[in-house]
UniProtKB/Swiss-Prot annotation:
SUPFAM superfamilies: RNA-binding domain, RBD (SSF54928). InterPro entries: Nucleotide-bd_a/b_plait_sf, PTBP1-like_RRM2, PTBPH1/PTBPH2_RRM1, PTBPH1/PTBPH2_RRM2, PTBPH1/PTBPH2_RRM3, RBD_domain_sf, RRM_dom. Residues 17-95, 109-196, 242-322 form the RRM domain. It comes from Arabidopsis thaliana (Mouse-ear cress). GO terms for molecular function: mRNA binding. The gene is PTB. This is Polypyrimidine tract-binding protein homolog 1. Pfam families: RRM_1 (PF00076), RRM_5 (PF13893), RRM_8 (PF11835). GO terms for biological process: mRNA processing; regulation of alternative mRNA splicing, via spliceosome; regulation of RNA splicing; regulation of translation; RNA splicing; seed germination. GO terms for cellular component: cytoplasm; nucleus; P-body. Gene3D superfamilies: 3.30.70.330. It is found in: Nucleus. Residues 352-399 are annotated as: Disordered. Residues 365-384 have a biased composition (Low complexity). The lineage of its organism: Eukaryota, Viridiplantae, Streptophyta, Embryophyta, Tracheophyta. Signal peptide: none annotated.
Length: 399
């Protein structure tokens, strides 16, 4: 709409004590709205973060003439209304007062519904969520899932007071950068109260956790059937887990061999088989573990990790449909670590890199993690220790 058209529209509207503001900057807060409007009169109510993009707001003045004064001023001014340097469009609202009816999400409860904005589900682990919210009190349970609104979580506290304190402190804030991987941008938190009062967690997994019951079995199933959001009740397909990971290797500036992959992935458990192949012009690999929990832990830790310093050879991981790989026991592109005679095959095959034999313990996943480089390339380990120490004892590099 042209400037003249907007001016005409303002004057053809029926004046109201409530002013409608559009095109607000991201995360515009009530104080910024009041600061813009207060010189025109007394403000009695506000309602912000409305609209599909949450970039609109309503401001109610005590007197109709005060609202008219504001709309008329900016309709004739050569300087548009601005908040944080962004032009804000102002017009009369169709409503004559702001009624803040409480939606179900506004009724206080002990369970918070948290939306993580700006990230994918694999970029914020359940351990990070627990760390952030446990600062306000004991967290009983957490369930994560994906909806149309994005990656979300239900966080259960002991009581309403604790949940309210967490919401007041964290709503609209961002998770500290040091808790996120280097490639992840800002992660903002949006919160409302959930209608749930006690989450039904059947298994411990990377998608759900019950901190009140340490004896709950570990299972790849994300949630009990009664927790519909965690099972993708909105129809969105939930990724099926597997003991075999499919890895896409991006930005390959250095060679990635079977031994290099074994070094990386064996830090999280015994690797049974590895196969490297080319598909659609990119290098991919299949890594087989003995069970799903080990594969899930490796996937969570290594997704987005760069094998080499400088952001090279970044891993993008998903679960494979395979459960048992059929690979050649020993080749340049595959390895079967379940064979008892593997060391003999290595000896027959001869030197692996730069004229030197592979490290004596390379077929042993635990021994493999004792050397920190491969062929002189700047490989950096991901952290497998909760305190941030790498398997080699050197500071980890998070790519």
């Amino acid at each position: 709409m042209s400037s003249s058209g907007q001016t005409q529209f303002r004057y053809t509207q029926t004046p109201s004590k409530v002013v409608h503001l559009r095109n607000l900057p991201w995360e515009c807060v009530e104080e910024e709205l009041i600061d813009l409007c207060k010189r025109f009169g007394k403000i009695v109510n506000t309602k912000s973060n409305v609209g599909a993009n949450r970039n609109q707001a309503f401001v109610e003045f005590a007197d109709l003439n005060q609202a008219i004064s504001m709309v008329s001023y900016y309709a004739s001014s050569s300087e548009p209304a601005q908040i944080r340097g962004k032009t804000v469009y102002i017009q009369y609202s169709n409503r004559h007062e702001i009624v803040n009816n409480q939606s179900p999400g506004d009724v206080p409860g002990n369970v918070l519904l948290v939306t993580f904005e700006g990230v994918e589900s694999h970029e914020v682990s359940i351990d990070v969520i627990h760390l952030v919210f446990s600062a306000f009190g004991f967290v009983h349970k957490i369930a994560t899932f994906e909806k149309a609104a994005g990656f979300q979580a239900l966080v259960q506290f002991t009581d309403v007071e604790t949940a309210s304190a967490a919401r007041s402190a964290l709503d609209g804030r961002s998770i500290p950068r040091y808790l996120l991987s280097a490639h992840v941008g800002s992660c903002s938190l949006r919160m409302s109260y959930s209608a749930h009062t006690d989450l039904n967690i059947k298994f411990q997994s990377h998608r759900s956790r019950d901190y009140t019951n340490p004896y709950l079995p570990v299972n790849q199933t994300a949630m009990d059937g009664s927790m519909q959001p965690a099972l993708g009740a909105d129809g969105k397909k939930v990724e099926s887990q597997s003991n075999v990971l499919l890895g896409l290797i991006e930005n390959m500036q250095y060679a990635v061999t079977v031994d290099v992959l074994h070094t990386v992935f064996s830090a999280y458990g015994t690797v049974q088989k590895i196969a490297i192949f080319e598909k659609n012009g990119s290098t991919q690999a299949l890594i087989q573990y003995s069970d799903i929990p080990t594969a899930a832990m490796a996937k969570e830790a290594l997704e987005g990790h760069c094998i080499y310093d400088g952001g090279y050879c970044k891993l993008r991981l998903s679960y494979s449909r395979h459960t048992d790989l059929n690979v050649k026991a020993f080749s340049d592109k595959s390895r079967d670590y379940t064979l008892p005679d593997l060391s003999l095959l290595v000896a027959q095959k001869g030197p692996a890199v730069s004229g030197s034999a592979p490290p004596a313990g390379w077929q042993n996943p635990q021994a493999q993690s004792q050397y920190s480089g491969y062929g002189g390339s700047p490989y950096m380990y991901p952290s497998s220790d909760p305190n941030g120490a790498s398997p080699s004892g050197q500071p980890p590099y998070y790519g």
